[in-house]
């Protein structure tokens, strides 16, 4: 489905362990993630749907482009935020003038917080075993 599209703009987003490749094509506002309708993939959560389409809403282009996404890794929230970043980057390729509005809203900033590694001698990343004085 993505291969035969005439004009498409792509953007990649990362969040935690999630990676999303977003393909933007002229259309009617459809969103499709991994070949599944967006509403079904996001479990009919209005918050997830709103978050993933928020860059389009900011620019007033909700029903002008279809969004096709390949997402893998992480959980649903991480994937939604990766989709949002990828969509914002694709919109910048579409029209460089969109960059200022998207940057102002913070959609072009990659959230760099990732899981801290577990250290030896500790139970988790920071949790130490119980200390006994005697």
Swiss-Prot record:
One of its GO terms (molecular function) is RNA binding. One of its GO terms (cellular component) is cytosolic small ribosomal subunit. Its main location: plastid. PROSITE patterns: RIBOSOMAL_S9 (PS00360). GO terms for biological process: translation. Coiled coil: none annotated. It comes from Guillardia theta (Cryptophyte). HAMAP family: Ribosomal_uS9_B (MF_00532_B). It comes from the Eukaryota. It is found in: Plastid, Chloroplast. Keywords: Chloroplast, Plastid, Ribonucleoprotein, Ribosomal protein. This is Small ribosomal subunit protein uS9c. NCBIfam families: PRK00132.1. It holds the Pfam family Ribosomal_S9. Belongs to the universal ribosomal protein uS9 family.
